[in-house]
């Protein structure tokens, strides 16, 4: 996989579109590990394939608000 990412949708994206996007992640071989559905924050965390990641980067600003790597932050 390309790695673990947190994908946050824009506020006006429909529930159907979000569900469809998550289904695509799974169909392409990725996994959904967490879902966020709060006012002002709709999205999911999961492992994305390089194919899904590239596609989502292309949707940024349109459907997707942000894509962040879901890494463990360590401080020295």
From Swiss-Prot:
Endpoints of the signal sequence: none
Single GO term (MF): serine-type endopeptidase inhibitor activity
Taxonomy of the source species: Eukaryota, Fungi, Dikarya, Basidiomycota, Agaricomycotina
Function: Specifically inhibits an endogenous intracellular serine proteinase (proteinase A).
Organism: Pleurotus ostreatus (Oyster mushroom)
Domain of life: Eukaryota
Keywords: Acetylation, Protease inhibitor, Serine protease inhibitor
Modified residues (N-acetylserine): 1
UniProt key word Membrane: no
Cited SUPFAM superfamilies: Protease propeptides/inhibitors
Protein name: Serine proteinase inhibitor IA-1
Keyword Acetylation part of the UniProt annotation: yes
Stored Gene3D superfamilies: Peptidase S8 propeptide/proteinase inhibitor I9 (3.30.70.80)
Family: Belongs to the protease inhibitor I9 family.
Gene Ontology BP annotations: vacuole fusion, non-autophagic
């Amino acid at each position: 996989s390309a790695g673990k990412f947190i994908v946050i949708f824009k506020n006006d994206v429909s529930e159907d579109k979000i569900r469809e996007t998550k289904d695509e992640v799974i169909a392409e071989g990725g996994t959904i590990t967490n879902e966020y559905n709060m006012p002002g924050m709709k999205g999911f965390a999961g492992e994305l394939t390089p194919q899904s990641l590239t596609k989502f980067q292309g949707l940024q600003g349109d459907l997707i608000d942000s894509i962040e790597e879901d890494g463990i932050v360590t401080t020295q």
